[in-house]
Amino acid sequence: MARSVSSFKLLGASIFDGLYVSISRRGYSGAPPAAVTASFGRPGAMGKVERRDAMKESSSSETRAYSSAWAPDPVTGYYRPENCGAEIDAAELREMLLNHRVRSQ
Protein backbone atom coordinates (compact mmCIF):
# COMPACT_ATOMS: atom_id res chain seq x y z
CA MET A 1 0.00 0.00 0.00
CA ALA A 2 2.77 2.40 0.95
CA ARG A 3 4.64 1.55 -2.24
CA SER A 4 1.61 2.37 -4.41
CA VAL A 5 1.07 5.71 -2.64
CA SER A 6 4.69 6.75 -3.13
CA SER A 7 4.62 5.68 -6.79
CA PHE A 8 1.38 7.64 -7.23
CA LYS A 9 3.08 10.73 -5.77
CA LEU A 10 5.99 10.37 -8.18
CA LEU A 11 3.67 9.82 -11.13
CA GLY A 12 1.52 12.80 -10.15
CA ALA A 13 4.59 15.00 -9.69
CA SER A 14 6.02 14.04 -13.08
CA ILE A 15 2.69 14.71 -14.81
CA PHE A 16 2.41 18.08 -13.06
CA ASP A 17 5.97 19.02 -14.04
CA GLY A 18 5.34 18.07 -17.66
CA LEU A 19 2.13 20.07 -17.72
CA TYR A 20 3.84 23.07 -16.13
CA VAL A 21 6.69 22.96 -18.64
CA SER A 22 4.29 22.75 -21.58
CA ILE A 23 2.26 25.70 -20.28
CA SER A 24 5.20 27.89 -19.38
CA ARG A 25 7.19 27.19 -22.56
CA ARG A 26 7.03 30.01 -25.02
CA GLY A 27 7.02 29.36 -28.72
CA TYR A 28 6.78 31.18 -32.00
CA SER A 29 4.27 30.39 -34.68
CA GLY A 30 4.22 31.94 -38.12
CA ALA A 31 0.54 31.23 -38.69
CA PRO A 32 -2.33 32.22 -36.41
CA PRO A 33 -4.15 29.49 -34.53
CA ALA A 34 -7.12 27.89 -36.25
CA ALA A 35 -9.54 29.45 -33.75
CA VAL A 36 -8.58 32.97 -34.84
CA THR A 37 -9.08 32.32 -38.54
CA ALA A 38 -12.28 30.37 -37.87
CA SER A 39 -13.78 33.31 -35.98
CA PHE A 40 -13.58 35.50 -39.09
CA GLY A 41 -15.17 32.97 -41.40
CA ARG A 42 -12.95 32.40 -44.42
CA PRO A 43 -9.33 33.38 -43.95
CA GLY A 44 -8.57 36.50 -45.95
CA ALA A 45 -12.21 37.53 -46.34
CA MET A 46 -13.06 41.09 -45.33
CA GLY A 47 -16.46 42.66 -44.97
CA LYS A 48 -17.42 46.13 -46.17
CA VAL A 49 -17.18 47.60 -42.68
CA GLU A 50 -13.69 46.22 -42.10
CA ARG A 51 -12.52 47.51 -45.49
CA ARG A 52 -13.93 50.95 -44.73
CA ASP A 53 -12.22 51.04 -41.33
CA ALA A 54 -8.94 49.91 -42.88
CA MET A 55 -9.18 52.66 -45.50
CA LYS A 56 -9.85 55.29 -42.82
CA GLU A 57 -6.86 54.14 -40.78
CA SER A 58 -4.54 54.15 -43.78
CA SER A 59 -5.66 57.63 -44.89
CA SER A 60 -5.27 59.04 -41.37
CA SER A 61 -1.77 57.57 -41.09
CA GLU A 62 -0.84 59.21 -44.40
CA THR A 63 -1.99 62.63 -43.17
CA ARG A 64 -0.05 62.13 -39.93
CA ALA A 65 3.09 61.36 -41.92
CA TYR A 66 2.79 64.58 -43.90
CA SER A 67 2.01 66.74 -40.87
CA SER A 68 5.34 65.99 -39.20
CA ALA A 69 7.51 67.78 -41.74
CA TRP A 70 11.08 68.71 -40.98
CA ALA A 71 12.19 72.34 -40.87
CA PRO A 72 15.48 74.05 -40.07
CA ASP A 73 15.93 75.12 -36.46
CA PRO A 74 16.28 78.93 -36.32
CA VAL A 75 18.96 78.75 -33.60
CA THR A 76 21.20 75.90 -34.73
CA GLY A 77 20.29 75.59 -38.40
CA TYR A 78 19.93 71.82 -38.12
CA TYR A 79 16.74 70.19 -39.36
CA ARG A 80 14.20 69.02 -36.77
CA PRO A 81 10.46 68.19 -36.79
CA GLU A 82 8.19 71.21 -37.12
CA ASN A 83 5.92 70.10 -34.30
CA CYS A 84 8.83 69.80 -31.84
CA GLY A 85 8.80 72.19 -28.89
CA ALA A 86 11.62 74.53 -28.04
CA GLU A 87 14.42 73.03 -25.98
CA ILE A 88 15.24 74.51 -22.61
CA ASP A 89 18.46 74.29 -20.66
CA ALA A 90 18.37 72.09 -17.54
CA ALA A 91 19.74 74.87 -15.33
CA GLU A 92 17.07 77.32 -16.53
CA LEU A 93 14.33 74.75 -15.96
CA ARG A 94 15.60 74.03 -12.45
CA GLU A 95 15.67 77.76 -11.71
CA MET A 96 12.07 78.18 -12.89
CA LEU A 97 10.69 75.19 -11.00
CA LEU A 98 12.46 75.53 -7.67
CA ASN A 99 11.40 78.18 -5.20
CA HIS A 100 14.41 79.83 -3.61
CA ARG A 101 12.58 81.65 -0.83
CA VAL A 102 14.39 82.12 2.42
CA ARG A 103 12.23 81.44 5.46
CA SER A 104 12.66 83.74 8.38
CA GLN A 105 12.09 82.28 11.81
Curated annotation (Swiss-Prot):
Residue ranges, compositional bias (Low complexity): 57-67
Induction data: By water stress; in leaves.
Superkingdom of this protein's organism: Eukaryota
Region Disordered, annotated ranges: 48-67
Keyword list, A-Z: Stress response
GO biological process: response to stress
Protein's UniProt keywords contain Transmembrane helix: no
Protein family per UniProt: Belongs to the LEA type 3 family.
This protein's name: Late embryogenesis abundant protein Lea5-D
